[in-house]
Amino acid sequence: MEETVMKPYVIGLDLGGTNSVFGIVDSRGDIKVTTAVKTQVYDKVEDYVDACVDALQVIIDQVGGIEKIKSMGIGAPNGNYYSGTIEFAPNLKWGHDGIVPLAKMFSDKLGIPVALTNDANAAALGEMTYGAARGMKNFIEITLGTGVGSGIVIN
């Protein structure tokens, strides 16, 4: 409870093939501030992460600084929750040829814990917790954007 009071916010990143949208939210899921970065203008992941951190710093300052941020979660195409990596994502210029340790890259830059998962699974979890699927035990979330994906919840 004390850490929630001291660090009341988390950062969410919806990493898409075209755009990356960031939000800082409180413990109730209320969005406090947002920003976005064009994903596809960066050929190298290092340049992408630097641009994201620069954009994030502006909204982090708006909520009182990094000391108010508990952690960050990333939903990404071909995201691997267990390794914190994006693996061979065909809709990302810098992600289609291999494995990208994106969670570690953001954690190293921001100094906070970062978790990463598949974007469709993250969307399903969000709907189950805050959205139209609240209270449902079985459903499928279909995501459409630069790519297509699905998150399946059973029991």
Q: What kind of region is each of these model predictions?
A:
Residues 18-19, 122, 146-149:
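Conserved A3 ("GATE") glycine/threonine-rich loop of ANL adenylate-forming enzymes
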Residues 60-66, 131-133:
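Alpha-helix termini
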Residues 77-80, 145-147:
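Short glycine-rich anion-binding loops that position phosphate/pyrophosphate groups of nucleotides
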Residues 14-16, 73, 143-145:
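Conserved S-adenosyl-L-methionine
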Residues 45-53, 70-72, 78-138:
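Glycine-rich phosphate-binding loop and adjoining helix at the ATP-binding site
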Residues 5-54, 67, 86-88:
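Short glycine-rich, Thr/Ser-proximal phosphate-binding strand/loop in the N-terminal lobe
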Residues 2-7, 23-25, 34-36, 40-46, ...:
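Glycine/GP-enriched mid-protein hinge/lid loop-to-helix segment characteristic of carbohydrate kinases
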